[in-house]
Amino acid sequence: MTQAKAKFLSRSATQAPHPALPILGRNLRCWISVVIPTKDPFASEARDNALLVRKVMVSTLNQWHFAPFVWDERILVHTLSLILNPQLFVNGAWSFSEVDTAREPRAQMVSHDTTISVEEDGIIFRSAHHPLIIKAVSLSPHGYPQSFSLDKMARAAGDVEGSLGFSSPFLITTYLSKTSYEKGKSYAQLKSARAEQMSATEIARFIPTLQEEARDWRAAVQSFEHGEGLVQLSHQVMIFPPTENVTHEVQTAIGIFKKMSIELMQDHLMHL
């Protein structure tokens, strides 16, 4: 019974599991990783600072009932092994393995059976004893809508009840970067002053975006006055389709994000 359920759910990730169920199954995972600038990452002061930041973030997430847990070495190795051996996962051959504490984690993430080839537009993963060859392709946004909120990212997994959905494993990364409060405030004030000058010129009557830009920077300055601030946001989409389905999956990813008013384009030479 367990094997039948597993087969049923695995099939639903790429195709409708039954004619009467036109849906796609999803096993979604969410990870949060924080990068803290430091000159000496191995210093005790830097580690204490990182532990303090982690404690604050865990407490904040608990307030919103996310109940996060801190990764250990085993979870780190298994998660990255799943990403770096996609051909094993797609062929149904990937499995958990015990972590060797005597070896560095980075030496245990890529299987000995995995062959990796770097191409201009992607990375090829293959194994000698498995038929499906996987090509990892990266896409990045080159245009965002005028107004965008994080809740719209709920559509990023595709329409599970429609025809527009990923039929291969995918990884969506959201980058959030925040500068120091004082630097951000000074930058917002300078940009706001410049935008206000441009919006007061005669040419602003013919270019409505100048008025909108002034309004946006005015709101940014007000956010700093209320103790808030600004963040820089970007996304990257990685898809892991079989080589024969790359074109279809790239167009699917572009279509999904286009419904969110985000224009994606395929990356080249990302490995450099």
For each predicted feature, which ranges?
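Extended, folded cores of ATP/NTP-driven motor/assembly subunits in large transport
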Residues: 1-272
